[in-house]
């Protein structure tokens, strides 16, 4: 018997090890990786918290269950208990083991589920904003109330578990007793048997359940700030004057009922317990009826008046939660009185107008600059650089390896040889070549660089497409980049990676389910395994509690490529704030900067006023750095993120209104403007552009993220919403309200005007013949002083599978007039060189002219030649014919 007991413990440990084998391997690898990236303390924060919490929680569970068990065995006169639980020590030992295992399990479940909420509770940071109903700081609702809710659910669940377990234990032991004594089971005696077996225990548990129902309704009171019963989010008139009153009564009555229940147990009377339970149920039902009556017979007919204070609460706190309360609002009275001098004063803004568009540029990059089939550009980023002494907006992209495209896609190729991408491509957004293609300032492999921007180590071991592990410093040289006659190779000189000791190779072989870690003869002692190379997944693994922007962007600094990811703190617990996309509070509180060679990942706090990020910083010590610790050259490229701006724009469409009466009527709703990308295509929400511009009251150009608003379900533009991001202006938001009594063209309405212009529509129709297609670029509406200049690039895509869209013309509009030109500069000249510095109304004059048939025939001839050249891959001939076609089109006036 002793030998069996001696074998039990090691056997139990072996079973546990097998059951959790993969988790143990993963845990060891995580320790090694977090140690490599210098965030081991962050990783152990969770584990340390769980262990610290488990000890007292285990003791509480163990003692509580043991005492409950002892209370069931205390009366020796109950035969059922004697037979089942008290006849010998074996039952006690068995229960001890059962209690130990269950208590550990429950303690782990509780600790692992709620460690984070407990740490948030203990490290709470005030918002210095109070809710208007209970006057509690917002931090209570975000950092403390979630823990109260969790405790309530756990305790109620445990109490119900005790009740159910007691009944199950009774029936099992009763059945065992009847079988052993050969007696029939009498269902009529169940009630008496239960009372004899655990009557007092069940009564105590019932009293505790009633007590916690009281606590649960106290939580419901606080949760009224999230009510959706009224016309706006948050506590409404009915919630405050009916629901709240009943909740308070229920809290008091259930508290009294729990005391009465416990006193009744002492006196041995069980009838008061039933009465207390009945009163509690009656009050809960009455509350629902009372709220229904108040809403339908008092509020409904007087809703606008009665709900105004609560609508105001919703407006104020929603604006605070989405950082819309600090927007600078200005009237923008459109005068359209620009003179030549105004154009000269805003030359830098006009020179940086984007005529290259995102989608066509990415297509062009992926056809012309991938160099080899296994390279790819994941997306295009937009930024600003001082190039050769001039402030320029640029497109740029990193050339990454697409390992899925490798042929042959062997283990060595995928993990040992093709380990990194190489280089970047950059072009100014405001210029194209004579063929209408992006004019590169950085291109090719090795990089051809026409700028003063140094790019001496352009390797990309960490990027947006680096989704697999690599092993570096092996016996095989890494592929670096292709040359005409051979491939250039490279040896990794960064410090990323985990050493490939035999133990580590074994761990990774198990973890990745890949025996090549052990069989490969190319792996040396000083080789290193680099994992978690995808930049977003890397950031998420270190700080999973942050929300990350969908568009990381690259920066060239110190000869290398760095990645910047915007990180957000979000919650859905902000009182009275209307939820959008499942959140009702957001801040861009951190920027993540990742080195593409070494993988160094740094989290910089960019919003010190955000209590949530400060709460994280207190919990995860050593994770965050101050913004000033980031290199100045990196900080200069911080952008206001589009994901944040998009959700703020969505909220602003409704919450620019501050008057509760106007808000209730819904009479001043906005929506983000629509746009149209194809001449006969569907409309989509306009993508907010980053623009280099001089704000009307400023004397210096800066990069601004700009959105256009329409009146809801109308195409008339009503406002411009901008976010600034250069230097000390970072994060400042400005709203220009346009005249409501004038027709101001939105991007979509501007497209309709283009389509309705007789001369332009004829040229578009000519271009659209025989399979070629005209595409609109990205519409830019540029504010200059008190005027708006509209710019629309036109792309021509020839027929053919591998055709490249080329920017061929630019349409400019000012003061309701349209000019079709080969460039912005030519269009500006055409507009402002007419008499009295006003737009020459060419469209009205041109409408009376007829088009020479011979010119149309010639145009068709050049077009056919261009298409033939394109099919043959002769891009020089293609460009020449397209230029001739453009000259003819310009001459048709």
Swiss-Prot record:
The keyword Transcription regulation appears for this protein: no
Domain of life where this protein originates: Bacteria
Protein name: UPF0182 protein CLI_0022
Keyword Transmembrane: yes
Membrane topology: Multi-pass membrane protein
Record-linked HAMAP family: UPF0182
Transmembrane segments: 9-29, 49-69, 94-114, 154-174, 202-222, 246-266, 273-293
InterPro entries: UPF0182 (IPR005372)
Subcellular location, record wording: Cell membrane
Family: Belongs to the UPF0182 family.
GO CC annotation: extracellular region; plasma membrane
Keyword field: Cell membrane, Membrane, Transmembrane, Transmembrane helix
